[in-house]
UniProtKB/Swiss-Prot annotation:
This is Peptide deformylase. Removes the formyl group from the N-terminal Met of newly synthesized proteins. Requires at least a dipeptide for an efficient rate of reaction. N-terminal L-methionine is a prerequisite for activity but the enzyme has broad specificity at other positions. Belongs to the polypeptide deformylase family. Binds 1 Fe(2+) ion. The lineage of its organism: Bacteria, Pseudomonadati, Dictyoglomota, Dictyoglomia, Dictyoglomales. Fe cation binds at C87, H129, H133. The keyword NAD does not apply. GO terms for molecular function: metal ion binding; peptide deformylase activity. InterPro entries: Peptide_deformylase (IPR023635), Peptide_deformylase_sf (IPR036821). Its EC number is 3.5.1.88. Pfam families: Pep_deformylase. The gene is def. It comes from Dictyoglomus turgidum (strain DSM 6724 / Z-1310). It comes from the Bacteria.
Length: 153
């Protein structure tokens, strides 16, 4: 089922999401709906708060294969890259954001197994973006000045 994507101004986007305690049918159905919604919206990632559920669940489109991560936690970050990001919850806006180039993170899969993952490049950026949603952080909160040099008038 395609879900409504919550937009900037919705209070659920600004609160810390709750840990998933049990991966049951309700969680699996939510993940299915999130993947369908992400694909329908041409997104590369989606976090549960974006569809109105305050749960620590993200889905990402990895090489055309959507993957769900339950209770993701970034353990290590390395390197720094500045690039523009958009967000389904902040339509029509792209802002420059510094992100780690490489990350190591852990998360549970849909069977409840905790695994460690390495990600780099775009995938690392998407995961950091979606984990931000779980912390109540939007791209406008992370945006950096486009230039640190300004001409004085």
């Amino acid at each position: 089922m395609i879900m409504e994507i919550r937009k900037i101004g919705d209070p659920i986007l600004k609160i810390k999401a709750k840990k998933v305690e049990k991966i049951d049918e309700k969680v699996k159905n939510l993940v299915r709906d999130m993947i369908e919604t992400m694909k329908f919206s041409n997104g590369v990632g989606l976090a549960a708060p974006q569809v109105g559920e305050s749960l620590r669940i993200i889905v990402v489109d990895y090489e055309e294969n959507p993957i769900a991560f339950i209770n993701p936690e970034i353990l290590e970050m390395d390197g720094e890259v500045l690039d523009y990001e958009g967000c389904l919850s902040v339509p029509g806006v792209e802002v420059p954001i510094k992100r780690a180039e490489r990350i190591i993170f852990k998360a549970q899969d849909l069977q409840g197994r905790t695994k460690r993952y390495k990600a780099k490049g775009l995938l690392a950026r998407v995961i950091q973006h979606e984990v931000d949603h779980l912390e109540g952080i939007l791209i406008l909160d992370r945006a950096v000045e486009e230039s640190t040099l300004a001409e004085e008038k």
